[in-house]
Amino acid sequence: MIENNELYLQTLGQNAKQASYGLASLTGTQKKALLSAIAASLTAKSQAILAANQKDVAAARENGLSEAMIDRLLLDDARLKGVISDIDNVISLNDPVGTELESQLLDNGLRLSRRRVPLGVIGVIYEARPNVTVDIAVLALKTGNAVILRGGKETLNSNMALSEAIREAITEQGLAADSVQLIKSPDRTLVSGLLKLDQFVDMIVPRGGQNLQRLCAEQATIPVILGGIGICHLYMDKDANIAKSIEVIANAKVQRPTVCNALDTVLIHDSLAETALPQLFSNLSAQGVSFYGCEQTKAIADKLGLAISTATDETYGQEWLSLTLGIKVVADIDTAIGHIRRYSSGHSEGILTDNIHASAHFINQVDSAAVYVNASTRFTDGGQFGLGAEVAVSTQKLHARGPMGLEALTTYKWIGLGEYTVRG
């Protein structure tokens, strides 16, 4: 029980800021050694971590959480090994810190350059996924940043086990353990307090649902990177290959339906509906998918003896995070684009077509962080993009957009080198 939330947060902030000064001076070699030590520590403590996660899973079932939520918080042996493997991927990435972005010699003799540097202290608020604890810590440390983590109460045991393993490795490398700090109390007022800790924290990244995003946008006095809500669309154009398109749709919907880059709505050109929808229903129904469709979609389903729900404005604006799919038949590509503009969260959209002009038009007119041609929305991921583990998927346009990798955790400073140069 924390007696004084304000003092607690001030202490976290001060310790993180102090730790960030040491991290900013680390060489690339030192950072690699640090991340290797973290991977080794997580491996050595894997059984304790999995046991802690089982406590969270058991509590979630007892509290009646949905299977989708339980899947999000689950850490089994394979997933934990995958998380640790991702650390090796980050180790192999080029360190952006210290990169000289540009340099010029001014007429007055001043050598002016722009150099990439750490942000300083990052606050990350997230829900359910314990792997985020490791992903964020590793990316922050790789870029010389300290981090304050606030996970969901559903994964508190998992997050404590993971963060302690990380902090132990940091200490073994002769660095401040408070380079990575976890808020261990589920008290929601601590979230509001963290959002106002602008004296110490340089950026807030919320990873969670609409309520969390809204809370951060409304209360933060620190720059906030919003995103992570994925209302994702695929449009099957009149010139699409139906069989191949259905394979892509199935992958986008079924492979892992509980994540933000999973497909939520399919838009189908009217000329393909009678042929494509029966095949789509057959494929996805066999994999447990249920449907919400427009009137034309329902009419086709009725002919097949398939009962589906009626789509509404509310359902088209739904991030399903489950084996549920919205379907709408559209007259043309511009109607599809109009639907996406209305309902999309700006995360990931795609067009399925063999028409190069249609794909170019779609790319230019759809304003989302990731736009695909003949590919699954499931690719919107830091690992898939070659960024290593990601901090978040930003749906904003300033500072970072799409999967946020290492560079998104840096800023730059101007450096002027003179010969006791004065301004004339």
UniProtKB/Swiss-Prot annotation:
It comes from the Bacteria. GO terms for molecular function: glutamate-5-semialdehyde dehydrogenase activity; NADP binding. Pfam families: Aldedh. InterPro entries: Ald_DH/histidinol_DH, Ald_DH_C, Ald_DH_N, Aldehyde_DH_dom, G-glutamylP_reductase_CS, Glu-5-SA_DH, GPR_dom. It catalyses: L-glutamate 5-semialdehyde + phosphate + NADP(+) = L-glutamyl 5-phosphate + NADPH + H(+). Keywords: Amino-acid biosynthesis, Cytoplasm, NADP, Oxidoreductase, Proline biosynthesis. One of its GO terms (biological process) is L-proline biosynthetic process. Its EC number is 1.2.1.41. Pathway: Amino-acid biosynthesis; L-proline biosynthesis; L-glutamate 5-semialdehyde from L-glutamate: step 2/2. GO terms for cellular component: cytoplasm. Gene3D superfamilies: Aldehyde Dehydrogenase, Chain A, domain 1, Aldehyde Dehydrogenase, Chain A, domain 2. It is found in: Cytoplasm. PROSITE patterns: PROA. Catalyzes the NADPH-dependent reduction of L-glutamate 5-phosphate into L-glutamate 5-semialdehyde and phosphate. The product spontaneously undergoes cyclization to form 1-pyrroline-5-carboxylate. Belongs to the gamma-glutamyl phosphate reductase family. This is Gamma-glutamyl phosphate reductase. The gene is proA.
